[in-house]
Amino acid sequence: METELTQLRKQESNNLNGVNGGFMAIDQFVPNDWNFDYLCFNNLLQEDDNIDHPSSSSLMNLISQPPPLLHQPPQPSSPLYDSPPLSSAFDYPFLEDIIHSSYSPPPLILPASQENTNNYSPLMEESKSFISIGETNKKRSNKKLEGQPSKNLMAERRRRKRLNDRLSLLRSIVPKITKMDRTSILGDAIDYMKELLDKINKLQEDEQELGSNSHLSTLITNESMVRNSLKFEVDQREVNTHIDICCPTKPGLVVSTVSTLETLGLEIEQCVISCFSDFSLQASCFEVGEQRYMVTSEATKQALIRNAGYGGRCL
């Protein structure tokens, strides 16, 4: 058994030597200050060989022994394991010059996607539109969930409000309202309309009956009004004559009246004329020449009536 164990240990040492050779190959890529010494592994193996083992031939004692590598004391630090001192930036003078110089960093070159951040592509716009549509749909669903009324319910409320407003207006127009419900308001309005139609028909019948006598009545009233408004008086005394005229006015009536009096041989001594609503003339005249004795007061009156445009109707 001891011979087998020694053979196994030799095989392990050979394997470690092969591994150490691999480490030497790796050291070629590492700086000289950081070389790995493969001899440390050989020293560890040599010390492992020098460990005294019990001479017992039992396999259980061999297995129960702890592995030798785990119980090795820590090796003192050797110059081979010491790492080289770290170099600072101040060991190189050109780095210090760059730090203390007024060196401005190079301009930052942004990619085209970051330079044109304000330019939105159509795909981004479409995605935003889809997002906005989704948000609006969510808002609508949230409103419905919160208990807000639907469009049909709001339309029905507006229709009922208009109907109630019209019923209240109809109720204010109709003078007789029996009850305040809708059926009574509509029934009272219909009855009131029938009553108004009956009154209209009755007035039309009365107008037709009086239509034949309307023309005659208008003539009579006009004649009576003319007779009441016309006034022609002539008061003749020895030498003086007093004239009083009142009639509807018309253009040129003053001039024609004065010329008529001069034709009859009367000269106006004093006269008062008013044309505010009707033509009114009050004059005092005296006779001129011998022809005045030939004209009577009645002839003077008829001449003034004809001059006013009434002929001989208002004698």
Curated annotation (Swiss-Prot):
Residues 65-77 have a biased composition (Pro residues). Gene3D superfamilies: Helix-loop-helix DNA-binding domain. The keyword Cell membrane does not apply. Keywords: DNA-binding, Nucleus, Transcription, Transcription regulation. GO terms for molecular function: DNA binding; DNA-binding transcription factor activity; protein dimerization activity. SUPFAM superfamilies: HLH, helix-loop-helix DNA-binding domain (SSF47459). GO terms for biological process: regulation of DNA-templated transcription. Homodimer. This is Transcription factor bHLH61. The lineage of its organism: Eukaryota, Viridiplantae, Streptophyta, Embryophyta, Tracheophyta.
